């Protein structure tokens, strides 16, 4: 392990021990805010500190065993020789774990997200594919125990969606889905195609971390135009007969959001405002990512929705992720929600990329 990394780990261990002492002091216990803040810091430092303590212990064991190798007692020397390989393997494993712990954490990883799927080129087939993608994400979300909340939907003329927006809530949603933003291309024979020709169409997906309720972004009410309209529901006994749907336009940027899912205008307005804040923040973050991308490629992408990331080839049952040259012949499983087949390799590559960066900068 590099000296610079060991120094960083030593500092983290010392801080962990210091915070542990502070948490036992009466003055800290009496101050709820400080106690809560230090408890959170202690919990964050605990895994890496305990791992580093195990690493130091293993290194000390290795030093002791190397000394025993020089012993005149042949039995002791033989025993030490047998133990050395085991301890060396332990050190290698702990070294790897420590490097993972040192990877900078994405502050958005624990957040809920807004998912937007929009039909692109390809007309009706693109809208149908947008529906297929939304179903894939919904199935995956259900398998993770996440909640899915529809915000708005514009239905395609022959099925699927021209655009659909939903909020997905649960544990570490953004950490799992942040690699999905970009253009998704589909190659398949449409049901209306009598000649059996393969058509190509595309959809764009945007994954945006939800803004905190404590207002990560300030919006001047004077910059908003708020319109109400009648929700375009499917009809039936619960048909929406009031102007409960909300459309909010942020005048300076031209960003427009709509929400028609709830029957209450108040609830639709609250959802639309949350989505607006998320979109405005996402636009700012995307701008920063594009600037960073000039110096460093990122698997999470630049935020450019036109960046083609994946192809779904139905005749061959093949999915290709172009960012890491990943090809999987389990397309039907993936479309049924087994998205881990794609997400896990992307996460591994992303972490390897971060580890390489860590090595370069240290």
Curated annotation (Swiss-Prot):
Post-translational modification, as annotated: Methylated by PrmC. Methylation increases the termination efficiency of RF1.
Keywords: Cytoplasm, Methylation, Protein biosynthesis
Organism superkingdom: Bacteria
Pfam families: PCRF, RF-1
Record localization: Cytoplasm
Signal peptide: none
GO cellular component terms listed in the entry, alphabetical order: cytoplasm
GO molecular function, one term: translation release factor activity, codon specific
Residue intervals passing through the bilayer: none
Entry-linked Gene3D superfamilies: 3.30.160.20, 3.30.70.1660, 6.10.140.1950
Record-linked InterPro entries: PCRF, Pep_chain_release_fac_I, Pep_chain_release_fac_I_sf, Prokaryotic/Mito_RF, RF-1
Coiled coil regions, renumbered to chain: none
Keyword Transmembrane in record: no
Modified residues (N5-methylglutamine): 237
Alphabetical list of NCBIfam families matching this protein: prfA, PRK00591.1
Family: Belongs to the prokaryotic/mitochondrial release factor family.
Function: Peptide chain release factor 1 directs the termination of translation in response to the peptide chain termination codons UAG and UAA.
Protein name, per record: Peptide chain release factor 1
Species in which this protein is naturally found: Legionella pneumophila (strain Corby)
